[in-house]
Amino acid sequence: MSAYGAIPREPVDLQPSRIYALKKRSDGEQSHTHMVCVHLRKDDIPNALEEAMRTSYNETLIEGSTYPFRDPMDKDAFQSYFFGYDVVVGVLVNASGQQYQDGSEVSLAELLGQGASTASRHDLLGKAQWPQQLGGFYYVKPNYPGRSSHICNAGFIVPTSSRGLGLGGLLGRSYLIYGPAFGYLASVFNLVYLTNLASAKIWERLGFEVVGRVPKAGLLRVPGTDKEEYVDALVIYKEFAPH
């Protein structure tokens, strides 16, 4: 839900899945080699995956440093907020010995060991291991209604157990493909808190620009304490390349 209420939008066709190589861990322990970004809608998401997503999202809310919401969301609230439009989920897979170009289209069935299966995305993802294979996820929705609905907004989550592996950057790269594929011409992030350095660096690296700053936009938790402090937020924008 945006500040403008529910924004009507025609659903788009499900887009192809895309693959990205994970950076190699320095300790040599790596059970997954790639992340497959999969376009989904509410009915495509099996219960175990939804629960893993909601758990990760609520852990992020409890941290109190990146999203404005104070309290964890129950199932209905999470579905309403996250699944109203389009969702992209990063699925961790082991594709060692195979060569893929980052961002290329792939068969989800083959990467999940189902061969040339014609099963639905819901059924395929139901065979994966959650939360072990959850690399991250994000929603994409219109930021404004009507005459400005060509500009979208997205919200990204990387599970705490998967941070530091560069997954946020891979999700961001996929967003540059999926955003215009969903029919949007540009993206805006309304609240990138100054303390969220990882996010700001990702968007700068991907060619986004800071177009505004909101003073004292968030009353955020101070890490390692019970205190809170006001933090400014950046407004970050990018026009998508033509799809």
Can you name each region flagged by the protein language model?
Residues 166:
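Glycine-rich phosphate-binding loop
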Residues 5-23, 190-192, 204-227, 231-235:
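Conserved catalytic-core motifs of GNAT/GCN5-like acyltransferases
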Residues 170-187, 209:
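Conserved acyl-CoA
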Residues 153, 198, 205:
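Amphipathic alpha-helical recognition patches that constitute DNA-binding helices
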Residues 2-80, 242-243:
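A short, well-structured alpha-helix characteristic of acyl/acetyltransferase catalytic modules
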Residues 179-194, 198-201:
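Conserved GNAT acetyl-CoA-binding A-motif
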Residues 56-59, 178, 202, 206:
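Alpha-helical interaction/dimerization surfaces of two-component signaling modules
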Residues 65-163, 172-173, 178, 239-241:
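Acetyl-CoA-dependent GNAT
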